[in-house]
């Protein structure tokens, strides 16, 4: 067979058979880790797709390679790289690391011949094909379709497009994409495949039909000759590889493959085409055996195509009525004395009758039901025949475990290969291999499901390991905000699973890309102080509250006018000076602009000095006593020591260290008598956490620069009403101020109430071996999936699992379940920074005396 395409424009192609075909690129639906309700919706969308089609159609799932250069370009998108040498180095190292690692994605396509509503349309298309053949014979230039022909085809294609459910987001294919599909088939298995062209930004505008004419609105409307497709040399069984007298020529059963030699490559592709010839007699269990989607579980590319012939249920019922009458006659003729014979194959008629009745019942469930005749083809390629057959054998054996039989028909490899091409007519072998079912039943195969995660560009957060086809997962927090969506992140994991590592990975990349971060570090090991060593030293500010080298005095870091407001809030929580009490009113008077200027107040230390001269028993004296209670302790240095330089709010990374600062327990906060007896240290700690969270809010909400607030072990903040209120502000209003919050804890309930938990769109759940905590984490990840035993087992047993030695293998560290901003869920592995100094600084694994990691 020759290349079937004569010419094309937009998503339309005119073929040698006289039929015009149209092709759309489809978007897969999330499925693998979705809740049962979401899976049911996906099956219903597939059912609507099959029930909306009529006649012939082809569904394609092709594995597209992803060029490492494109990964680098996505990481650079939106970054002024000239002033970001650290990010440029990270991208360069990422590019080097991807050079030998195959990454890719699966692309989905629907292509269908356009059956004209009038005989003249079909006659015109046939005449065009005959004329093209004659011109080829006479060596004359081919005639391109006229504007009227394009317009007519566009109208018919629009009807097909309207039948495609919007959930699959159909976009009209371009000639570039159609050429890529043909080239991909010729280079299958050679690792030479180029990435699939990006779909147009407005694919639905490929044809602008007005007054019966097609107007070229962009490059996609240009008529492209079929010569754009390279003509391959097809050699079934690789006969050209055999010596003239080789005995292998007489053993064709051992050579069930197709050798494809493309003009685009000096190397031939060896491909095995498998066709579905048998399925479980009793059907398959759904969810659980979505058999077409199973191809993504292989760690090598497997393309698939489904040739469909869809017939309305009413037409099938009329046909089956005739079959029923014939079957009744056969049963009557084979009956003896009114009893059906079971000898000489007569007994099988009862099985036929039962099958016919079951099929009729299935068709009668809905007036929209259709009959689907589907020929399913899998294509596996390699650079040599042995590898191709080995991979194909693995596919066959894997499917055979579920009672699905795939065979490589002898002598039919070339026909199956062409059957996977848009525009190629259906040949006899393909029709003979069709499996007959209903639209509802075939929808349970859910072929159009995607494992895509993350954003189109941004920082490289993780590798997608949901399926055997690994690909990069990008996180574009700024882009998400610009799309008017929240970009806050929640991290949940048990101890040592990697939530702190992930938080530091995100924060470090954000700083390298030009953003700002505010991180509260409460760890005794001061791990974020260590992490700060990998950041820009002149733009990083560390504030150790217990051993301060910088002051957090609000009057000094904000200025007296703005700082006065923060002082009143701080003293309310720390000293019990309520704004409307006598002491609160006195404090407000002292910090008024007039008195501040008169008294020379520039800091809390100077304010305390002014109050030192107050009359005994006065409100000023009482304020001085309360302030001295804190100022004279080591706790108070960070607020009252004027010898310390004030915190520089211009720093790109601000990291307060709160290790050693105790906090009241939730029980103490809930019981008044316990709260009244709190130690000074706990009162101070509670007030400072609330102040730090407010400080973070002030910094993040007062700049146009993209800023991130990070709270590891966030229960230290959310246990207090003040801290919880500030966190809720971040989650509610961060988007408006170009800011996000990143919260981490062992339990999602630590993020706050149901409102706070629900306002976190990007959710990451790492290893949780405790079933109860794992269920809570999964219920937060997506309501409903906690009851799925398969997903619960996946989280507790197969996310960064420990080996027999109690250690997690290096290649299994950092695994997690991720729900992205588009609410798609999949399994990922967090990638480590490529720069060695950053990688060392964000690790929290203890090391022994020999320098080796202890865990």
Please state what every model-predicted region is:
Residues 76-81, 280-368:
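Surface-exposed, low-hydrophobicity interaction/linker segments
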Residues 1-4, 20, 37-47, 53-55, ...:
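An aromatic-glycine-centered, glycine-rich loop/turn in mixed alpha/beta architecture
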Residues 489, 563-606, 752-855:
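P-loop NTPase motor core of the ASCE superfamily
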Residues 36-54, 315, 418-472, 522, ...:
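P-loop NTPase motor domains
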Residues 60-77, 88, 98-99, 501-596:
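Switch/coupling segment of Walker-type NTPase motor domains
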